[in-house]
């Protein structure tokens, strides 16, 4: 009886055992192995053969080049500038603008906190302001109703 059960299990166990032995000896399953290559003998340190021609910066680009700190004055900016230089200047100005906006956001939050604390000390709240508005609206509606009733009686 055990021989019938043991047969398929033995075959499966043998297969697993062979697989484990292969893993132990080789260290990997040799699937999709790329050949080991060392660093190439002549790495290309030169720029690629193609390069975009010089770019004539607009007035806005010149301002960005100055704001980014690349040039001190407009006169120092050459007639043609590489696109990479203008792109780097735009990125630097973009980052500076983000920092300025973060600072302004933090400043605005602090101003709102201070104004909220002052409103609390004056006993002002949105609920009280809304209640006053609604009471005024009710009075105006009541007054209009009375005026309409008086006009209807007069006619």
UniProtKB/Swiss-Prot annotation:
InterPro entries: DUF1075
Major location category of this protein: membrane
Pfam family, one: DUF1075
Topological type in the membrane: Single-pass membrane protein
Cellular compartment(s): Membrane
GO terms for cellular component: membrane; mitochondrion
This protein's record includes keyword Transmembrane helix: yes
GO biological process: cellular response to hypoxia; neuron apoptotic process; positive regulation of release of cytochrome c from mitochondria
Keywords for the protein's UniProt record, in alphabetical order: Membrane, Transmembrane, Transmembrane helix
Membrane spanning stretches: 95-114
Family statement: Belongs to the UPF0389 family.
Designated name of the protein: Protein FAM162B
Organism: Danio rerio
Taxonomic lineage from the root: Eukaryota, Metazoa, Chordata, Craniata, Vertebrata
Gene name of this polypeptide: fam162b
